[in-house]
């Protein structure tokens, strides 16, 4: 299953990059990449957050998220700033997916933001892997494809 998940993630990564560039996002910019992690409880999530930090990622504070059916998960992001290159993102996805599998935590995809080539930040220009039609409406969880 892990191999097919990673293959799917590689394909989704290329789709996101293509969509961003087609929409005019700056190909030369450094992008904030947010890898979404979730677990059933805080203690489990904290373990993966500590390990991600040791790997060089910035880790956001844990938040509780209610998903379909009323189930509650603890979530955080492992964040890096890199060029928008599929190979770099693929390597991070594989690294974090392997970590989450070892610690029995969910890897919920990755996201990034539109980078204006003119240097102007536009609020709400986020690409979400769940929303293949463009910008996401979510405040903190951009660009995730499952």
Swiss-Prot record:
Pfam family for this entry, one: RraB
Gene Ontology cellular component annotations, sorted alphabetically: cytoplasm
Region described as Disordered: spans on this chain: 110-146
Amino acid composition bias (Acidic residues), ranges on this chain: 115-134
A GO MF term: enzyme binding
Gene3D superfamilies documented for this protein: RraB-like (3.30.70.970)
Keyword Cytoplasm: yes
Superkingdom of the organism of origin: Bacteria
InterPro entries: RraB, RraB-like_sf, RraB_dom
Biased composition (Basic and acidic residues): 135-146
Keyword Ligase tagged: no
Record's subcellular location: Cytoplasm
Keywords recorded for this protein, A-Z: Cytoplasm
Oligomeric and partner information: Interacts with the C-terminal region of Rne.
Function, in words: Globally modulates RNA abundance by binding to RNase E (Rne) and regulating its endonucleolytic activity. Can modulate Rne action in a substrate-dependent manner by altering the composition of the degradosome.
NCBIfam families assigned to the protein according to its UniProt record, in alphabetical order: PRK11191.1
HAMAP family reported in the protein's UniProt record: RraB
Family: Belongs to the RraB family.
Stated name of the protein: Regulator of ribonuclease activity B
Protein species of origin: Sodalis glossinidius (strain morsitans)
């Amino acid at each position: 299953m892990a191999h097919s998940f990673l293959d799917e993630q590689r394909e989704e990564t290329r789709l996101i990059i293509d969509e961003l560039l087609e929409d005019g996002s700056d190909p030369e910019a450094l992008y904030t990449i947010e890898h979404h992690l979730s677990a059933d409880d805080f203690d489990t999530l904290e373990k993966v957050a500590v390990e991600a930090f040791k790997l060089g990622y910035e880790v956001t504070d844990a938040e509780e998220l209610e998903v379909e059916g009323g189930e509650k998960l603890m979530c955080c992001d492992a964040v890096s700033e890199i060029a928008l290159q599929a190979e770099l993102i693929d390597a991070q996805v594989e690294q974090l997916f392997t970590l989450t599998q070892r610690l029995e935590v969910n890897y919920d995809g990755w996201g990034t933001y539109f980078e204006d080539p003119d240097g102007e930040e536009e609020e709400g220009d986020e690409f979400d892997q769940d929303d293949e039609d463009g910008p996401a409406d979510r405040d903190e969880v951009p660009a995730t494809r499952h």
